[in-house]
Swiss-Prot record:
Role, per record: Catalyzes the attachment of proline to tRNA(Pro) in a two-step reaction: proline is first activated by ATP to form Pro-AMP and then transferred to the acceptor end of tRNA(Pro). Can inadvertently accommodate and process cysteine. Misacylated Cys-tRNA(Pro) is not edited by ProRS; this function may be provided by ProX.
Molecular function GO labels: ATP binding; catalytic activity, acting on a protein; proline-tRNA ligase activity; transferase activity
Protein name in the entry: Proline--tRNA ligase
InterPro entries xrefs: aa-tRNA-synt_IIb, aa-tRNA-synth_II, aa-tRNA-synth_II/BPL/LPL, Anticodon-bd, Anticodon-bd_dom_sf, Pro-tRNA-ligase_IIa, Pro-tRNA-ligase_IIa_arc-type, Pro-tRNA_ligase_II_C
EC number(s) per entry: 6.1.1.15
SMART domains for this protein: ProRS-C_1 (SM00946)
Family statement drawn from the similarity comment of this UniProt entry: Belongs to the class-II aminoacyl-tRNA synthetase family. ProS type 3 subfamily.
Catalytic activity: tRNA(Pro) + L-proline + ATP = L-prolyl-tRNA(Pro) + AMP + diphosphate
Main location: cytoplasm
Gene, per the UniProt record: proS
Any GO CC annotation of this UniProt entry: aminoacyl-tRNA synthetase multienzyme complex
Keywords linked to the UniProt accession: Aminoacyl-tRNA synthetase, ATP-binding, Cytoplasm, Ligase, Nucleotide-binding, Protein biosynthesis
HAMAP family for this protein: Pro_tRNA_synth_type3
Length: 481
């Protein structure tokens, strides 16, 4: 075996001893990404991109089912457009990358590489919209954005990342709010039904909301190490951008009106979430519905008569059920090496078939999530595997929920909160006064932020547990990626 192959299946860093190094080991050894010559710009390799494609497919289907259309807007945005919404430009100014020259000629106006597309899209909407009859505008684009980050980590925080961003216009405030919450619900559905990641949904505090938004809503997931990951956001932008960009339409009474505006997005950081919620010390553990390969078939003693034929027959039967299958008949590697390889890559099910199995009309199937292995009849193997994949998804979601709940705590006072955040980091549930000064002090003292004001509220007391003033909300707090 070549040295490179030996390195590939070698143990990775223990996640409980050095979680950041564990994460780096996993993303590189499983061939998800590589580092490019430009700091903060990652190369997403085919295996990593296939995961993104499955996320795309789920979201794209749900967007279209809810009436949205895909389109594409330019990468470069004139500085004058970016400056039109004051709060927005101030929020993004430190992260903007600028184009100053075209060839050797200096441009008359700087162009920013889009950090997000509200401004360029609103400039076009102002040209297009004339009447209430044209509303709503329900547009989405799949693209990359650039935010010049100082500290980067693949998938979690990179200077360039892939995402989708939806931008909609509505006749009324009520319709815009309904859209904002509908899209957040789709993100929650995606997290739980596709990625097997339980999330807390709610509203961001004013301090944490999107620059230029009236309100930002979020889904928050908890990683293995007790840090939170913002996994999708939906913004009610009210009329902030439509007024700044003079987007008007003739209303039902004949008067000119400003439409109500939303935007919402999810990105490749979701892949980082999958890794950190489900992974273990053997590598990736991929939820079946997002895994590029759901089942790998490994023939045992494949040189024996009938083994490969049966393996391909099983592959065909599984594919007929819509299951994504890889059959590894490469004779350069032993079955044991393949077992290690596909475990590290997180393939949900491994099906082994050899002469004795064929004789007994069975196959051995190993689950990546539990590392258990059992014998299953080859009769109706397609239905058996399909049901097993659903079981794996359900079990992974419930394990992740149990882990999150075990790392969610309440506290009697600020001192206990600070101590628990150091000793047993996770989600803290506490009562908060709603004041920005109090929130800023929490972050300054501890590095912890309010992740959201959850839709489902609990009354844990009448006073703010951080400053003693009357409490307005129960909030979730955590350190975050």
């Amino acid at each position: 075996m070549a040295k490179k192959d030996q390195e590939f299946v070698k143990d990775i860093t223990n996640m409980d001893e050095d979680f950041p190094q564990w994460y780096t080991d996993v993303i590189t050894k499983t061939d998800l990404v590589d580092y490019s010559p430009v700091k903060g710009f990652m190369v997403i390799k085919p295996y990593g991109y296939a995961i993104w494609e499955n996320i795309q497919a789920f979201l794209d289907r749900r967007f279209k089912e809810t009436g949205h259309q895909n389109c594409y807007f330019p990468l470069l945005i004139p500085e004058s457009l970016l400056n039109k919404e004051k709060e927005h430009v101030e929020g993004f100014a430190p992260e903007v990358a600028w184009v100053t020259h075209g060839g050797s000629e200096k441009l008359a106006e700087r162009l920013c590489v889009r950090p997000t597309s509200e401004t360029i899209i609103c400039s076009m909407y102002s040209k297009w919209l004339t009447s209430y009859r044209e509303l709503p505008y329900l547009y989405n684009q799949w693209c990359s954005v650039v935010r010049w980050e100082k500290s980067t980590r693949p998938f979690l925080r990179t200077s360039e990342f892939l995402w989708q961003e939806g931008h909609t216009l509505h006749e009324t405030a009520e319709e815009a709010q309904a859209e904002t919450l509908q899209m957040l619900a789709i993100y929650k559905e995606m997290a739980e039904d596709l990625l097997a990641i339980p999330v807390v949904d709610g509203r961001k505090s004013d301090r944490e909301r999107f620059a230029g938004a009236a309100a930002t809503y979020t889904i928050e997931a908890l990683m293995h190490d007790g840090k939170a990951l913002q996994s999708g956001t939906s913004h009610n932008l009210a009329q902030h951008f439509t007024k700044a960009f003079d987007i008007t339409f003739q209303g039902r009474t004949g008067e000119l009106e400003y439409p109500h505006h939303t935007s919402w997005g999810a990105s490749t950081r979701l892949i980082g979430g999958i890794i950190m919620v489900h992974g273990d010390n053997r590598g990736l553990v991929l939820p079946p519905r997002v895994a590029p390969t759901q089942v790998v078939i490994i023939p045992i003693a494949q040189n024996k008569e009938g083994v490969l034929d049966k393996a391909y027959e099983i592959k065909k039967e599984l594919e007929a059920k819509g299951i994504r299958v890889t059959l590894d008949d490469d004779t350069n590697y032993s079955p044991g090496w393949k077992f290690n390889q596909y475990e590290m890559k997180g393939v949900p099910l491994r099906l082994e078939i050899g002469p004795r199995d064929i004789e007994n009309n069975v196959a051995m199937i190993a689950r990546r999530d539990t590392l258990s292995k059992d014998s299953y009849s080859l009769d109706n193997i397609g239905d058996t595997v399909k049901n097993l994949l659903d079981t794996v998804h359900t079990d992974m979601l419930e394990r992740a929920r149990a882990h999150r709940d075990s790392k969610t705590f309440t506290f009697k006072d600020y001192e206990e909160f600070k101590r628990k955040m150091i000793e047993t980091p996770g989600f803290a549930k506490g009562m908060w006064c709603g004041e920005e000064e109090c929130e800023a002090k929490i972050k300054e003292d501890t590095g912890v932020t309010i992740r959201c004001i959850p839709f489902v509220q609990e009354n844990l007391g009448e006073t703010c547990q951080f400053c003693g003033k009357p409490a307005k909300h129960m909030v979730y707090l955590a350190k975050a990626y």
